[in-house]
């Protein structure tokens, strides 16, 4: 899996993408300017390699690569607190479905989410990206999140496992 430097493909990017050794592309904020630009970028990538896997980290909160023209998503800790306070057992699943639907609409195949670590305040990298400091809340919310992704048709990839 490779990444590219900007919002358009360079000749070097096109050459790399056409290599039989490249099977995936991950996109970041540096690759996003607008919904239309992103859609066209992905369309161009697929014209070079139809079966390439295109991925992103679109967790919500501070890890949301595409912001403008996409729904502003809270951190998973904020989402978990909201769901718990409002006794809304479907909120996390619905949120994941929404994120996934927006990504699928522009041509993204996989979202590297959810974070599966437990927020023990040991790492500033994880922090509010985790659903909770409670193991069962993390398990239940992560399961709901993955279900929402799958219902929308998005592949998931749990990351930052406990430890």
What are these regions, as identified by a protein language model?
Residues 1-10:
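Boundary/entry segment of secreted carbohydrate-active catalytic domains
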Residues 6, 60-61, 148:
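Glycine-centered flexibility motif
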Residues 9-23:
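N-terminal glycine-rich anion-binding loops that anchor highly charged ligand groups
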Residues 21-138, 160:
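Enzymes and membrane/adaptor proteins characterized by extended Gly/Ser/Thr/Asp/Glu-rich
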Residues 142, 146-162:
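Phosphate/pyrophosphate-binding betaalpha-module
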